[in-house]
Swiss-Prot record:
Family: Belongs to the LptD family.
Signal peptide limits: 1-24
Protein name (record): LPS-assembly protein LptD
GO terms (BP aspect): Gram-negative-bacterium-type cell outer membrane assembly; lipopolysaccharide transport
Length: 784
């Protein structure tokens, strides 16, 4: 039995099977120009019973045993065709067989083809009963796909299921180019299993052999097969030389895994990255476990830590079972706060301030749903590791619509908050929220009147440390009951734009909302889960200023806004603009002295927001938004982008984003917003571009500049060359990777990456632009 040892060579050939890049139609069509296609009518089913047709210039024989055909001999049966200068037909009776065995020997310019392969050589043999075929000292070419080579002997077996090569070679390069090839003493291609087995395999670049393996198994189709994927290498200032060698494991039809040894020179060890994917009756999920046994750099930088092991565990699951049960997991945990600064990972970033660990189980039937969940946070700040977790939380909703003209709902929540620090307050919170709605609507407008009661009870513990250090004392038991009343009206007006743009339609959509919530002093309640909600135009019409339930601001306000849209004759939205404001009749308060703007006693028009989108053409788009808050005395946030996009490989985008330091302080958790890099807010201008610059060459670049710090924030440049049988990519990235508190400046990481992949084994001809765009620390977002 021949020993089977998976080797690195499988990596270099199997890559196309697992690639997720899109198609580059131009390159794909160019590559297929050199590939033969099957141009005869395809015969379906069993072709062995079909008649054999023989055409030749001359024929002679001893009927019925032997016959010799010479001169342009052409033999056809079903999808198979054999041509040669001379063919000798032999027919013999076989004991126990109803039909005689018919074989042919072919000499001179032998050409065999069917809908799978073309074989050419000076000598051939075929069994017309079984379709077994031999061709000696010739070459072969796959039909309808890239793949060709040579062999001392080429055999078709198993009714064209197997192609067997003795001392053969394989390459996906087009005729005239042997950039790479695989040579083996025996190659067996199984079309049903979509796998090729190669013994004594040598991988060649041009005529030079560079790698040997006694056995190689590689996928040659879309069927999942275990094997090595393409290796990657890069150099970074954080880890120096890095090398990845991923292995794909097809465990079962409903589960697979990718195991990647990741060598990092500076760390002095190999990180094992293990990604597991599964599909079950309870849903689909993905798990990732990365483990570095020891890290010499971390050990030097943190001598007081008992262990230098670094690890990450990620689990994402979502599923429904029996149509009523819902299961969700969103769990990320790392060994230490510096993990995402030291290692690139798609499940977290150096700009993240925390990792979330959330589990939930839900039950839902008509008019009712309930969810039990737990939520924890791992804070990465070394200055303040305080954070609250919900252990556990119960949410219940009951709906009953069409109660006369009304819709009703009752929402309830019970949650227990625990802090990571022993001296911080903890609480059990119970909340009940009955709601009644009166919805009225017609073709041109709607009005929704809503009333609800917000009743919350707190039982707070562990208050001694906090109360001893603050003037405002927390209460062990606190109740808060407040009604809420809201009226929300909308109208939609529509007109044809025949004078300016025939076929176009414009809408005018005014909206007005009145909201009333009485003031309740919440200073005796600690803030466990509330923060200021980010606002855009639609956010102006929210009921709440804060997320969570610990801070419910009073409201006596009117929100007004208007949206206008323009649709073309194909009902595609070409333009929209929205502008709105909140007018406060009385100040919005919670009684919390830590909220600075509550001390201003401001009323009137305090918050403005606007959004716009303009699809100038099918290739040009403009998008922007702004929020102004007089309580912050400045623009709170703004963003804008303009983009030209010809297709997924040809695009240019300019963008700008801004967030004031006051806004960041108000919206983000305290342990996150006090980080030094956010004290001046965010003000970044950037550009992203992707374009094929020459035949088969493409380039991707991104550059972001921090106008507050007057320095580069992030940049990336990638270049890829793509051909029909290989692609090479080189990339450079400089990105923000944390903050040095001692030196009070940002820390950057520089990375140079190199990647090579073999093409032609699948339909992947992507130019690599989408993958390079996604790799940036600020990923590209489509404006159109």
């Amino acid at each position: 039995m021949k020993k089977r040892i998976p080797t690195l060579l499988a990596t270099m050939i199997a890559t196309a099977l697992y690639s997720q890049q899109g198609l580059a139609a131009d390159l794909a069509s160019q590559c297929m120009l050199g590939v033969p296609s099957y141009d005869r009518p395809l015969v379906q089913g069993d072709t062995n019973d079909l008649p054999v047709t023989i055409n030749a210039d001359h024929a002679k024989g001893d009927y019925p045993d032997d016959a010799v055909f010479t001169g342009s001999v052409d033999i056809m049966q079903g999808n198979s065709r054999l041509q040669a200068d001379e063919v000798q037909l032999h027919q013999k009776e076989a004991p126990g067989q109803p039909e005689p065995v018919r074989t042919v020997d072919a000499l001179g310019n032998v050409h065999y083809d069917d809908n799978q392969v073309i074989l050419k050589g000076p000598k051939g043999w075929a069994n017309l009963n079984t379709k077994d075929t031999n061709v000696w000292e010739g070459d072969y070419q796959m039909v309808g796909r890239q793949g060709r080579g040579k062999a001392d002997l080429m055999k078709q077996r198993g009714e064209n299921r197997y192609t067997i090569l003795d001392n053969g070679s394989f390459t996906s390069c087009l005729p005239g180019s042997d950039t790479w090839s695989v040579v083996g003493s025996e190659i067996i291609h199984d079309r049903e299993e979509q796998v090729a087995e190669i013994w004594n395999a040598r991988f060649k670049v041009g005529p030079v052999p560079i790698f040997y393996s006694p056995y190689l198994q590689l996928p040659v189709g879309d069927k999942r097969r275990s094997g090595f994927l393409i290796p990657n290498a890069k150099y970074t200032t954080t880890n120096y030389f890095e090398f990845y060698l991923p292995y794909y494991w097809n465990i079962a039809p409903n589960m697979d895994a990718t195991i990647t040894p990741h060598y990092m020179h500076r760390r002095g060890n190999i990180m094992w990255e293990n990604e597991f994917r599964y599909l079950s009756q309870a849903g689909a999920g993905l798990m990732e476990l990365d483990y570095l046994p020891s890290d010499k750099v971390y050990k030097d930088e943190h001598p007081n830590d008992d262990s230098s092991r670094r690890w990450l565990f990620y689990w994402n699951h979502s599923g429904v079972m029996d149509q009523v049960w819902r299961f969700n997991v969103d769990y990320t945990k790392v060994s230490d706060p510096s993990y995402f600064n030291d290692f690139d990972n798609k499940y977290g970033s150096s700009t993240d301030g925390y990792a979330t660990q959330k589990f939930s189980v839900g039950y839902a039937v008509q008019n009712f749903n309930a969810t039990v969940s737990t939520k924890q946070f791992q804070v990465f700040s070394e200055q303040n590791t305080s954070s609250y977790s919900a252990e556990p939380q119960l949410d219940v909703n009951y709906y009953q619509n069409d109660v006369g003209p009304f819709d009703t709902r009752i929402y309830g929540q019970a949650v227990h908050f625990v802090n990571t620090r022993d001296d911080m307050p903890e609480a059990t919170r119970v909340h009940l929220e009955p709601t009644i709605n009166l919805p009225l609507s017609n073709n041109w407008g709607s009005i929704n009147t809503e009333a609800k009661l917000l009743a919350t009870h707190y039982q707070q513990t562990n208050l001694d440390w906090y109360n001893s250090r603050n003037t405002t004392k927390l209460a062990e038991s606190a109740n808060r009951v407040m009604p809420q009343f809201k009226v929300d009206g909308r109208m939609v007006f529509e007109r044809d734009m025949e004078m300016l743009a025939p076929g176009y339609t414009q809408t005018l959509e005014p909206r007005a909302q009145y909201l009333y919530v009485p003031y309740r002093d919440q200073s005796k309640i600690y803030n466990y889960d509330s923060s200021l909600l980010q606002s855009d135009y639609s956010g102006l019409f929210r009921d709440r200023t804060y997320g969570g339930l610990d801070r419910i601001a009073s409201a006596n306000q009117v929100t007004t806004g208007v949206t206008s849209r323009i649709y073309d004759d194909a009902a595609v939205e070409r333009f929209n603009i929205s502008v709105g404001q909140i007018y406060y009749f009385t100040e919005s308060r919670t009684g919390d002295d830590n909220i600075t703007w509550e001390n201003d006693d401001k009323t009137g028009s305090l918050v403005w927001a606007g959004d716009t989108y303009w699809r100038i053409s099918d290739r040009w788009g403009l998008r922007g938004g702004i929020q102004y808050d007089t309580r912050l005395d400045n623009v709170a946030t703004s963003n804008s982008s303009i983009e030209y996009r010809r297709d997924e490989d040809r695009l240019v985008q300019l963008n700008y984003r801004y967030a004031s330091p006051e806004y960041i302080q108000a919206t983000l958790p305290k342990y996150y917003s006090t980080a030094e890099q956010y004290k001046n807010g965010i003000s970044q201008v950037g550009a992203v571009a992707s374009w094929p610059i020459a035949d088969r060459w493409s380039i991707v670049g991104a550059y972001y500049y921090d106008t507050n710090a007057n320095k580069q924030a992030d940049s990336m440049l990638g270049v890829q060359y793509s051909s029909c049988c290989y692609a090479i990519r080189v990339g450079y990235e400089r990105k923000l990777n944390g903050w040095d508190n001692d030196k009070q400046h940002a820390v950057y990481d520089n990375a140079i990456g190199f990647n090579i992949e073999l093409r032609g084994l699948s339909s992947n001809y992507g130019l690599g632009t989408q993958e390079m765009l996604r790799s940036n620390i600020l990923p590209y977002q489509n404006t159109l």
